[in-house]
Amino acid sequence: MSNMDFLPISKEDLKKRNIDVLDFIIVTGDAYVDHPSFGTAIIGRVLEREGFTVGIIAQPNWNNIEDFKKLGKPKYGFLVNSGNIDSMVNHYTASKKKRHDDFYSPGGKSGYRPDRAVIVYCNKIKEAFKDSPIIIGGIEASLRRFAHYDYWDNSVRRSILEDSSADLLIYGMGEKPIVQVSNLLRYGMKIDSIKNVRGTTYIEKDISSLKDYIEIPSFEEVSTNKKSYAEAYKIQYYEQDSIRGKTLVQKHKERYVVQNPPQPPLSQEEMDEVYALPYARTYHPMYEAEGGIPAIKEVKFSITSHRGCYGSCSFCALTFHQGRVIQNRSQDSILKEANMMTNMKDFKGYIHDVGGPTANFRHRACKVQEKHGTCKNKQCVFPKACKNLIVDHKEYLSLLRKIRKIPNVKKVFIRSGIRFDYLMYDKNDEFFKELCEHHISGQLKVAPEHISDKVLNLMGKPTRNVYDSFVKKYYDINKKIHKNQFLVPYLMSSHPGSDLKAAIELAQYIKKMGYTPEQVQDFYPTPGSLSTTMYYTGINPLTEEKVYIPKDQKEKRMQRALLQFSIHDNYDLVKEALIKAHREDLIGNGPDCLIPYNKPYKKSHKKNNAKNNNNHYNKNNNYNKNKDISKKNKKNSLSKHKKRK
């Protein structure tokens, strides 16, 4: 592909297109990948469709002001985002250690973007072009639009609008608001006069003219009073709906952050239009010499079928970004994309995914949402299914069958998360059966996250019984279709509410599973999530109940070690945790014991894998099917718990 297949990135590109001055310049923390899985590509192509000229400055050197000047000054303004991931999450692990890789950068190497990229980029743009309007968007801006707890500073920060000095913030999915804002600018309206576009947030000195709004506790209040913080979050959480949501206001000293209500979800026709735009569907050729951009590998042959999620997991901030209302593409649109993929030169016959935030949420949760919006204080699937929930996989199954029939398609995988409780609510097993038969490559990844019901309740996840039922049904179906397929459970340690007792309960469950899960992570308090509010305040803002928070680093390491108790290096931490919790009964050689009395000699990794009854996964998350594992071990260690998720 040539540069002409992409949006312009240089003065040379502008010259070839006979563009003297660009209308907009997008500055992004990611490398430039022109694919609909990347927000920069979508916004750029949407604006191009509307008749605007758009240039891209990807990962500018923030220490060199000239990098921000290389495309000149835009006619209407700069659009700034940190990339597909919050820059702090991208750069640091849950234990605040620096990451050494970055899948959204050339060659997968880190160091191409600054911490707090949106703020840094905006400050540099103001330095280069003092009076040029700046509009911020994307995940980093969207989830930091109000005063928010910042895990890396361990303090409450102001709205990112204040810290970045941007003129306007677009939150959530930005196609509709950016078109409306850009057209207002084209008609001659000044950026500081644009105050009525849904899905936008701005700073205001005087709110006397505002009507029908809710004022939440101020920055000064939430930064000094945790109850006020919890109250502010609760109001934000309840008002994220395009039909019933109100304008929200939060005072920051003498000014006010004003959030207009969310934009209505995209219609199916609008979704189809967005995904039919002329994307190059790969990274810009300028990265070829550096090894390309690793992030394209997972999405190049994946299809986004819908947006939104009504699962409402507490640790996920999707409610604040994509929303709870499902927005889906038509089958025709998806089939056209699948057919197009088969004509790409590097297509090998495998479509890696057809899904969204939750693969099997292909339609709205209920008909009530269409007229009245999402319920204010009630969830669709938690703690149990709402009586109005539409449980039906028929349309999704129909779509998958059609894709499977496309010439040159060998296999269609589903790698987006499957919501197993929703799957269990469906009395028709047809989808479940075909999922196992056609759409899994030996294993299905599922996210029970924990097994203690008190922790699951705080996570917004279904109870252990639901998961156990799913596990059993999964293996029953696989047995019937004569497939030896496994489950890979994602598990989380140190979530709010999880104490050592809960972690030990999970460790005992893992012991019965018969293998050590690799998909384990510590809870990561990222901006915008309900769980992060619990972590900071020690309060569940929705119930106002106090919540136990494991903040001590030693305890957090113990909880994580318990989830991988059979790993040699974790022995001391596990033993210390069991003694601290007065669970010495789990130390010894009995069948229920987690560890022996004495620390065993450390074996080589290769040798340990061959003899380990826990049957570690290999690096590709496949079960290590070593010949040394007897059939008896396989049967007893694995078959019971393959059913999970």
From Swiss-Prot:
It comes from the Bacteria. InterPro entries: Elp3/MiaA/NifB-like_rSAM, rSAM, rSAM_horseshoe, UPF0313, UPF0313_C, UPF0313_N. Its cofactor is [4Fe-4S] cluster. Coiled coil: none annotated. Signal peptide: none annotated. This is UPF0313 protein CLM_0251. Residues 295-566 form the Radical SAM core domain. Pfam families: DUF3362, Radical_SAM, Radical_SAM_N. [4Fe-4S] cluster binds at C309, C313, C316. The keyword Thylakoid does not apply.
